[in-house]
Amino acid sequence: MAQAGRTGYDNREIVMKYIHYKLSQRGYEWDVGDVDAAPLGAAPTPGIFSFQPESNPTPAVHRDMAARTSPLRPIVATTGPTLSPVPPVVHLTLRRAGDDFSRRYRRDFAEMSSQLHLTPFTARGRFATVVEELFRDGVNWGRIVAFFEFGGVMCVESVNREMSPLVDNIALWMTEYLNRHLHTWIQDNGGWDAFVELYGPSVRPLFDFSWLSLKTLLSLALVGACITLGTYLGHK
């Protein structure tokens, strides 16, 4: 596989296509448009639901409420360094890893979905609290996969609760977090190419992932207006 160089691949593309995949598994068709046509390093372009599941669309006044009530800083679109297109095998390997993870912890994810209590006012705070806890003790590939699965759960739950505009916000927050907090670790550990080489279909089954042999604490506790997700404990 061709190396992407120090700058790596476009995290925005990885996020958008992963969310599209997770929503399509539930029968929701989220059209992300031509991801590759957007300026590399820019903020994600909003997606469009070709099948709009909500009978009462979220009022426009609420669509930006999550961003305004979040402890995270708003993302600013920039024209950063040139990034390499993401090879299809990266998307495929990440999808397989996410599916394997969700199968192993199906009951936990179902419980998490029922306790998220997402609203346009709370969504970004929920996201920030969970992600902070997830990476509190460090980064590894297992936690990165869990990060993508959690984002997918939030998107599906948003559509289920007739708040589909939140999906675009969640994609933005995920891209922002990857760029600001995970990109350096990913590059220092061989980039997404290393992820594929370590855990791709031609190497070993996903069920043999050492970081999926988790002593998992996937518990949700509501404390006031915040939600805490126990860290997915894993090892590289």
UniProtKB/Swiss-Prot annotation:
Q: Where is this motif: BH1?
A: 133-152
Q: Where is this motif: BH3?
A: 90-104
Q: Which organism is it from?
A: Cricetulus griseus
Q: What does this protein do?
A: Suppresses apoptosis in a variety of cell systems including factor-dependent lymphohematopoietic and neural cells. Regulates cell death by controlling the mitochondrial membrane permeability. Appears to function in a feedback loop system with caspases. Inhibits caspase activity either by preventing the release of cytochrome c from the mitochondria and/or by binding to the apoptosis-activating factor (APAF-1). Also acts as an inhibitor of autophagy: interacts with BECN1 and AMBRA1 during non-starvation conditions and inhibits their autophagy function.
Q: Which stretches are annotated as coiled coil? A: none
Q: Can you summarize the PTM annotation of this record?
A: Phosphorylation/dephosphorylation on Ser-70 regulates anti-apoptotic activity. Growth factor-stimulated phosphorylation on Ser-70 by PKC is required for the anti-apoptosis activity and occurs during the G2/M phase of the cell cycle. In the absence of growth factors, BCL2 appears to be phosphorylated by other protein kinases such as ERKs and stress-activated kinases. Phosphorylated by MAPK8/JNK1 at Thr-69, Ser-70 and Ser-84, which stimulates starvation-induced autophagy. Dephosphorylated by protein phosphatase 2A (PP2A).
Q: Name the residue ranges of motif: BH2.
A: 184-199
Q: Name one GO cellular component term.
A: myelin sheath
- Motif BH4 covers 10-30
**Which PANTHER family does the entry mention?**
APOPTOSIS REGULATOR BCL-2, BCL-2 RELATED
Give site residues, Cleavage.
D64, M65
On this chain, the residues bearing Phosphothreonine are T69
Give any GO molecular function from the UniProt entry. Answer: protein heterodimerization activity
Q: What is this protein called?
A: Apoptosis regulator Bcl-2
Task: Cite the domain annotation text.
Answer: The BH4 motif is required for anti-apoptotic activity and for interaction with RAF1 and EGLN3. BH1 and BH2 domains are required for the interaction with BAX and for anti-apoptotic activity.
Q: Which residues are annotated with the PTM Phosphoserine?
A: S70, S84
